[in-house]
Amino acid sequence: MRLWHEALIEKLPRAQLLGQHRECCALRGKGWAKKHSMVNYVFNYSPYKLFQYHLEVMNEMKIRGYHPDESWFDPLYRGQKCEAYLELKKITQTLPIYPEHNESYLESCRENLKEKGIII
């Protein structure tokens, strides 16, 4: 499980883009705060940041003709098996959304994709 550097979202092949959507759904739902070495940093921030990242993924999906469930466009939604947030303070989006998504992380993501035979 990993969140690709946001600069790569629009360049990701279909499988990685759709996989990213699934991972965001899992993290926003019952996966919230469950330890995983590659994504632990997201739990240091408001869940609203994950919503912002997920929104980038879903907007790219829509550009490509996919139809993510509209429920996920609600920042309070956490999936069918998890209670929605009652309240979640809206925060201004930063660039990058997560400070961990720096140049070093971008290169790490590119290397990971390259190992899968994907050159971006």
Question: What role is predicted for each listed range?
Answer:
Residues 1-120:
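Expand to "…catalyze enediolate/carbanion chemistry for C-C bond making/breaking, isomerization
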